[in-house]
Amino acid sequence: MQSLLLALLLLPVCSPGGASNLHEDLTLLRTDLALRLYRSVAAAGNQTNLVLSPAGAFIPLELLQFGARGNTGRQLAQALGYTVHDPKVREWLQTVYAVLPSTNPGAKLELACTLYVQTGTPLAPCFVEQVSRWANSSLELANFREPNSTAMLANGWGPRQTAGDEPVGSAWERGGGAESAQLVLVSTVSFQSAWRHQFSSDTQLLPFTCAQGLTLEVPMMYQMAEVNFGQFQDPAGHQVGVLELPYLGNVASLLLVLPRDRDTPLSHIEPHLTASLLHAWTASLKRARMEVFLPRFRIQNHFDLKNILYSWGVIDLFDPLRANLKGISGQDGFYVSEAIHKAKIEVSEEGTKASAATALLLLKRSRIPIFKADRPFIFFLREPNTAFVFSIGRVLNPLH
């Protein structure tokens, strides 16, 4: 049997007539799928910080749809809720993927997927052509027989690692099978940008009440700016504040969802978040001048996507006896042995200039409304024009 390693290396770094209805429906579908992935990961993560990148997780699965046949293809379509074999879906996704990459001054957004193929492995010409046209994807030859070759490929493709980052390859080595791989898919979503409105460089230590009730002193960033803000209620009656912080060039924004009641845990809000609800909230945000307090945080996660997909009914893809990926190669026996997702996000003052008189602003009383994220919150890194979600996560303890 031929082993296919599906690696998802996702490293975001942060310092919407008939056709329109279809596009809106697909946007909501993708957001609901992203939220489903978030809930699946959150359920297994217990009381921990979390970040994941739905965009990078689903692009390789879309590529696999081009090569999946029979029950394998049906399971993928049922899990995703759409199929790239539908011309309208394919056209919409290609349009979205085409407009996402950005190299505006002060902002950089990259979206890519590379399919590494063992030298000598025959591939279907149709599949090769489809890969070349999908989400800035490309095909490269590799020799997986060399020691640690898959690790080097994955780590070399993604943005440079920093101290403390665990190589994706180490997760593969624990799972095994790398040396027998014939294909490796590596997906990257990379975002780096300065804020449109600068945070002060004079960050102060302020209290943050963690999920367990423990209060810690954490680096709390501050700015006074015109922002999009609203106060809403979820279907269960929980009150939340929603704030949108734009990045330079409007290439993306950070959407924050904060419970108004300090005694309301995120676990009471997470099950009620839907794409329709988020759309209604963001459409109702109003411009307001506010004082914004946001903790500096850095989160890195990696997890086995295979377990989640298995719980979604994607079973045959990982079974060497049942997987049907004949659209990739004329050879029998291709299956996916590993699906590793790795994501990182860093929210800080970097890339912005210092503001004056910050200490006074932090301490004085003011009639200006305040948004203070001094307790657990949920965040969405998204493209504002298409509502495309790059990353979802939560902060339970900014120091972890």
Swiss-Prot record:
| Signal peptide residue numbers | 1-19
Q: Report the subcellular localization.
A: Secreted
Q: What is its main location?
A: secreted
Which sites carry carbohydrate? 46
Q: Which UniProt keywords apply?
A: Glycoprotein, Protease inhibitor, Secreted, Serine protease inhibitor, Signal
Q: What are the GO MF terms of this UniProt record? A: serine-type endopeptidase inhibitor activity
Q: What role is this protein assigned?
A: Probable serine protease inhibitor.
Protein name in UniProt? Serpin E3
**The gene coding this protein:** SERPINE3
